Regions:
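Short amphipathic alpha-helices within nucleic acid-binding modules
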Residues: 22
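Short, mixed-charge low-complexity intrinsically disordered segments
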Residues: 9-15, 27-52
Length: 52
């Protein structure tokens, strides 16, 4: 699974393939990030994983 943190201006802030790493990142940065999107692989569509 690929996770991508998006800022409010739609720029990418952080990317990872680790669910634990993204959970930890959200806990620390939840006030400054806009959305986290995820997808299973390069050919799969994106889905919202977390949203402010």
């Amino acid at each position: 699974m690929e996770y991508t943190v998006i800022k409010k201006d739609w720029s990418i802030e952080f990317e990872t393939t680790s669910q634990q790493e993204i959970e930890d990142y959200i806990k620390v940065h939840k006030d400054t990030i806009y959305q986290v999107i995820c997808r299973h692989d390069e050919d799969a569509p994106f889905h919202v994983y977390w949203s402010k």
